[in-house]
């Protein structure tokens, strides 16, 4: 499993850099490319990719210190990304020496001893380096950027816009584990009944005041592996996405134009508010994302929405008059 996860992570990070793909898109492409579809390997690879990307500025800084007088850019894409992953695995995941050795062996198996031999010296240095001392050695804005895992240009922009005190609060909050929210899907059944089914699967929820069917997850297992999720009893949805549909407030008689609609959180929420009556025209320019949208509409029992493959920057192939237009770019995973 570890070898497959390392192979997926190396290749996915490379696609992200080459074609500016998202974590999810690059992993989906790599899984198909390498024919690796094991759920455990994919889950492990996804965690590596997300955390390595989130901490990339610090990882690259430390890697370049370790590799000095050379740098990451002196090596192939595969070697560069394995060094990044090894740094995450050993310094941020806090692996023990046996786990670090197993990870290194997996990298050698994926890339080959010949490719990694020029940087073998770096792996021992990585184990002994103190990341905090590297961060303390940076100056001013660069130190703050490293300490909070943000790019310097973003830190500088926020300070100009918000001032230093508010920027510090923002940067620190960005590193907190985000709250998970779900929407109970009343297109499937009564809210009270659906809540009881989730409780049977060990999910603990806290309602949000003044907002119908939206709950904060207090305790959870893997939500997407639950039978209630597969049957469409609930949808995992960011709170800001929920507020879009609530603000639009569509009625059962409305025709809604949902632009940038995939993967479908807002579409399905509006269909729920409309009680599966009326009409939703769902526009997206990505055929791949519309396939995901269709899958979600089936899972969530949405019957009133029509997918339209089109670019909203061009004239749309429509003659209908919409009562409500929902435009919320950039949308999920853009």
Tell me the role of every PLM-derived stretch.
Residues 1-334:
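S-adenosylmethionine
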């Amino acid at each position: 499993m570890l070898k497959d996860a390392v192979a997926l992570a190396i290749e996915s990070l490379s696609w992200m850099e080459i074609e500016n793909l998202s974590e999810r898109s690059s992993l989906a492409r790599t899984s198909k490319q390498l024919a690796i579809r094991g759920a455990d390997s994919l889950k492990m690879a996804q965690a590596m990719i997300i955390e390595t990307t989130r901490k990339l500025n610090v990882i690259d800084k430390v890697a370049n210190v370790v590799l000095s007088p050379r740098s990451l850019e002196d090596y192939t894409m595969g070697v560069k990304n394995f060094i990044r992953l090894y740094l995450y695995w050993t310094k941020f995941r806090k692996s023990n020496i046996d786990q670090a050795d197993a990870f290194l062996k997996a990298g050698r198996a994926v890339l080959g001893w010949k490719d990694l031999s020029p940087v073998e010296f770096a792996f021992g240095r990585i184990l002994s380096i103190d990341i905090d001392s590297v961060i303390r050695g940076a100056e001013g804005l660069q130190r703050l950027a490293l300490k909070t895992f943000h790019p310097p240009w973003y830190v500088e922009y926020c300070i100009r816009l918000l001032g230093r005190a508010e920027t510090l609060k923002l940067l620190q909050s960005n590193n907190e584990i985000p709250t998970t929210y779900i929407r109970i899907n009343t297109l499937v059944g009564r809210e009270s009944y659906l809540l009881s089914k989730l409780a049977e699967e060990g999910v603990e929820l806290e309602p949000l005041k003044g907002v119908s069917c939206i709950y904060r997850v207090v305790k959870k297992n893997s939500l997407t592996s639950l039978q209630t999720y597969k049957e469409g009893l609930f949808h995992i949805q960011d709170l800001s996405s929920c507020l879009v549909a609530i603000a639009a407030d569509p009625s059962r008689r409305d025709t809604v134009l949902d632009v940038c609609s995939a993967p479908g959180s807002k579409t399905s929420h509006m269909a729920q508010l409309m009680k599966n009556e009326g009409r939703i025209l769902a526009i997206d320019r990505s055929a791949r994302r519309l396939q995901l949208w269709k899958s979600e509409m089936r899972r969530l029992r949405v019957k009133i929405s029509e997918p339209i493959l089109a670019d909203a920057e061009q004239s749309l192939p429509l003659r209908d008059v919409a009562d409500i237009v929902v435009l919320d770019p950039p949308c999920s995973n853009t």
